[in-house]
């Protein structure tokens, strides 16, 4: 079914909010009984993972998954990632894991890594975009894993935001964007990684050997994969818009805050190199380490200088910039270093222009 053919669900009463403390396992298990039941019944429940908040639906319930697409305005060709409780449970949606996939799971699961694997026929086409593969992940966030256990079913869960907009890293982001269109939000506090999972296709055979095809940069870097002994290759280029994709997050326009983003550098005195028009419109700044030179900015977001800290805070900063009413946001250019590849990809797809 094409995205344009899906019924756009009308707003309904605000989603239920279930607040949990990830450090209190017993109380969290009790609090997740109800949302687990709602997921089995075909309802939509947003929940925290270590990467971003996901919009969960029973991955084996085609009608529930179709509602995810409708709520997000997501095109049908864009496959979803299925979240399972453990590597052993991956075979609920994927055929037997190859030795290469098992080694990868042992090293990086639970964690922010998605494997694209041959699907089982029980997985509805709507989950996979009609492909014969399915993306599978075991999240490391304790609330996510307890919710999957409470539901008793694998959860198809894209980011809990309208398609192409900034992903949510807090429960409030979800309420602001989808709160009147879904059934519940499990509030487990802010996420810790801050961007989506890395996606790899696991390939092995006499013609290709054993290798990982890196389809999306994310919470696990290429360097980490290679340091663990895996052979990693990348596609030459993204596939054409609208074509079937093996990975989500590869649409050219994505993660966008609705404000033009313009890259800027630093002057020799360390201040941001901002334009100085005669009558500047309200502008925002997104900088690393300090906001020197941005004294006239209507909104100034200063993130840590290290890649982990910057990544963790990026989407929250973009949400604040989107809400600031500024006409443009000047973004400090990132280091040209492989460690920054994932966050640079997000900013490029968000519309960052140099």
What are these model-predicted stretches?
Residues 2-354:
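Active-site-adjacent structural elements in enzyme catalytic cores
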């Amino acid at each position: 079914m094409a995205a344009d053919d899906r019924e756009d669900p009308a707003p309904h009463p605000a989603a239920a909010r279930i607040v949990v403390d990830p450090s209190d396992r017993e109380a969290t298990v009790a609090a997740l009984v109800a949302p687990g039941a709602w997921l089995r019944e075909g309802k939509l429940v947003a929940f925290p993972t270590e990467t971003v908040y996901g919009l969960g639906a029973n991955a084996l319930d085609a009608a529930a998954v179709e509602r995810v697409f409708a709520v997000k305005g997501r095109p049908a060709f864009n496959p979803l990632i299925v979240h399972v409780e453990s590597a052993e449970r991956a075979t609920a949606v994927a055929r037997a894991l190859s030795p290469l996939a098992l080694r990868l799971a042992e090293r990086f699961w639970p964690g922010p890594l998605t494997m694209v694997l041959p699907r089982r026929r029980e997985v509805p086409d709507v989950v996979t975009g009609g492909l014969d593969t399915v993306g599978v992940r075991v999240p490391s966030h304790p609330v996510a894993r307890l919710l999957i256990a409470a539901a008793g079913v694998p959860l198809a869960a894209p980011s809990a935001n309208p398609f192409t907009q900034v992903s949510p890293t807090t429960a409030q982001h979800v309420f602001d964007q989808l709160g009147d269109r879904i059934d519940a939000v499990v509030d487990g506090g802010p996420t810790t990684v801050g961007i989506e999972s890395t996606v790899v296709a696991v390939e092995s055979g006499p013609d290709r050997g054993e290798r990982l095809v890196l389809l999306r940069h994310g919470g696990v870097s290429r360097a980490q994969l290679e340091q663990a002994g895996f052979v990693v290759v990348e596609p030459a280029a993204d596939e054409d818009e609208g074509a079937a994709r093996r990975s989500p997050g590869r649409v050219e326009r994505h993660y966008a805050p609705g404000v033009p983003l313009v890259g800027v550098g630093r002057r020799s005195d360390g201040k941001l190199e901002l334009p100085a028009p005669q009558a500047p419109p309200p502008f925002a700044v997104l900088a690393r380490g300090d906001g020197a030179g941005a004294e006239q900015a209507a909104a100034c977001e200063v993130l840590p200088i290290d890649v982990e800290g910057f990544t963790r805070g990026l989407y929250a900063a973009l949400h604040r910039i989107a809400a600031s009413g500024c006409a443009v946001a000047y973004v400090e250019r990132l280091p040209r270093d492989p460690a920054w590849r994932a966050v640079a990809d997000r900013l490029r797809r968000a519309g960052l222009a140099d």
